[in-house]
A protein has these predicted regions:
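Acidic, surface-exposed loops and disordered segments
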Residues: 1-226
Length: 226
């Protein structure tokens, strides 16, 4: 969990080459990602040539900071294979999911090995195909920049757990989720206080109502009014 929560998107890199063993381990992490029916339709292109990295940065909508990363990994999918097993859904959806799962594994592995990485999804697809020699039956999905980080970005703001967590059906919020996982939440504490107050108020009302009914009943028996 620490690796997940401390990972950051790195866009500044030191001018230090990466040990190829670490690059290989990062790619191995991508290959460990799940795929539908274990079809393993992902493909990985490791780019370290300076000129080609400059071309990739240009194709990624002129994100020139990418050139400083000594390694780019282009994650592609073999859409012919995806379609062969799962038809149009495999070609249009599963293939994208597989590349995304591989990319996330690789980002975490990079962080584990002390490397910085960033997920790039904005690029000219045809330009990327040309630069990396991607055949027509394959499609580039994600580019990951990789290198030793030259920055430590702060943790970006995130919504609290119960904001987007539902139980059983969409929109049914899990208001006690943080209590279940022992994670304090001001929102949950507020709900607990409100619930206790409502119970106390309800109890007091019931007691008062019971006393009134008792007085009324006693009055009927004795003919006295309280």
């Amino acid at each position: 969990m620490e690796c997940i929560h401390t990972r950051r998107s790195i866009r500044k890199y030191q001018d230090i080459p990466i040990e190829f063993e670490k690059v290989g381990r990062v790619v191995e992490a991508g290959m460990a990602a799940p795929t539908a029916g274990n079809i393993q339709d992902y493909r990985f292109i490791i780019v370290q040539d300076k000129g080609k990295r400059a071309q990739i940065a240009e194709a990624c909508l002129q994100q020139y900071w990418m050139e400083a990363a000594p390694t780019h990994i282009v994650i592609c999918v073999d859409i012919k294979r995806s379609k062969q097993f799962y038809g149009i859904r495999g070609e249009r959806l599963y293939s994208v999911q597989h590349a995304a799962a591989a990319a996330m594994n690789m980002l975490l592995a990079a962080h584990h090995f002390g490397l910085g990485a960033c997920w790039i999804g904005a690029f000219d697809e045809e330009a990327m195909k040309s630069i990396c020699g991607v055949p027509e039956y394959a499609r580039p999905e994600v580019i990951i920049t990789l290198g030793y980080p030259d920055e430590i970005p702060p943790r970006p703001p995130k919504y609290i757990l119960e904001t987007f967590s539902y139980i059983e059906r969409y929109g049914n919020r899990i208001r006690t989720f943080p209590l279940v996982i022992a994670e304090p939440s001001p929102v949950i504490e507020k709900h607990v206080r409100e619930t206790i107050a409502a119970v106390d108020e309800g109890t007091n009302k019931l007691l008062a109502k019971g006393v009134e009914k008792g007085k009324s009943f006693w009055g009927k028996l004795t003919g006295k009014k309280e």
